[in-house]
Amino acid sequence: MYTSGYAHRSSSFSSAASKIARVSTENTTAGLISEVVYREDQPMMTQLLLLPLLQQLGQQSRWQLWLTPQQKLSREWVQASGLPLTKVMQISQLSPCHTVESMVRALRTGNYSVVIGWLTDDLTEEEHAELVDAANEGNAMGFIMRPVSASSHTTRQLSGLKIHSNLYH
């Protein structure tokens, strides 16, 4: 059977292209760190924006970790929000100085699809880089939730998100 040189070139080209695509896919990291600055007087914004993502992540076999400052998540809210109660873990009463360290350790394990932590202070460049590396290593998402009072919104980001405090008990 006769095949032209053109056919050989195109098949070797597609083979090379598939190798490049495979290598670039293997090198692509899927981790993400995002900071959500929210106003305390706009409770529905966080629910509208974050809940669909958290619901989708809840379909994975991995856990969702919530590192909350003081409040405890309400079972009723978790269930009503469409989040999988059996995959949501919470650690509360965590001091801010331990939140970043705990997030890094949790993200790095790969056991969590998402790790959510509350911080009032800005991250240092080093902390942010450490979180990004951990999220990439664990193929996970991390959300830094940063509350801002309504009066201070003029000096900060104008749009914001919030998981409302009445969702806790």
UniProtKB/Swiss-Prot annotation:
Protein induction: By DNA damage, as part of the SOS response.
Pfam families registered for this protein in UniProt: SulA (PF03846)
Region (Lon protease binding): 162-169
Keywords: Cell cycle, Cell division, DNA damage, Septation, SOS response
GO BP: division septum assembly; DNA repair; negative regulation of cell division; SOS response
Source domain of life: Bacteria
InterPro entries: Cell_div_suppressor_SulA, P-loop_NTPase, SulA_CellDiv_inhibitor, SulA_enterobact
Region of interest (FtsZ binding), ranges: 106-112
Subunit structure: Interacts with FtsZ.
Family: Belongs to the SulA family.
PANTHER family for the chain: BLR3025 PROTEIN-RELATED, CELL DIVISION INHIBITOR SULA
Its job: Component of the SOS system and an inhibitor of cell division. Accumulation of SulA causes rapid cessation of cell division and the appearance of long, non-septate filaments. In the presence of GTP, binds a polymerization-competent form of FtsZ in a 1:1 ratio, thus inhibiting FtsZ polymerization and therefore preventing it from participating in the assembly of the Z ring. This mechanism prevents the premature segregation of damaged DNA to daughter cells during cell division.
Protein name (record): Cell division inhibitor SulA
Upper lineage: Bacteria, Pseudomonadati, Pseudomonadota, Gammaproteobacteria, Enterobacterales
